[in-house]
C-alpha cells in the first residue's frame, strides 16, 4: 500500500508539531484526517470497529511521517525511538494493539 503524504497540519492547540533537543526531535501528538482534511473522531467499539480503527491509526502514522518529511526531512532521521499510541474505546474493547498496529506497521 503506497503512502500519500499530506500537508503538515496546523496545531489545534498551543503547541508546535516538532520540538528539537540535542539530536532528538519530538513530534507532538497527531490526529487522523480524512481525504477532505477533516479530523476523524469516534470511539472504537461504538462508532468504529477494529478494522476501521486500524485504518484511522494508519492515517495518524501518515500524519506523523508527513510532519517528519515536511518539517524535518527524512534524510536527517536515523531512527524512530518511540511511538506512543492511545485508543479511545469502549470499556469492553480489548484489542487496542491491533488498532495501534495501523500506525506501527508504517515504521
List where the protein language model places each region:
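N-terminal presequence-like segments and the immediate start of the first folded domain
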Residues: 1-81, 89-107
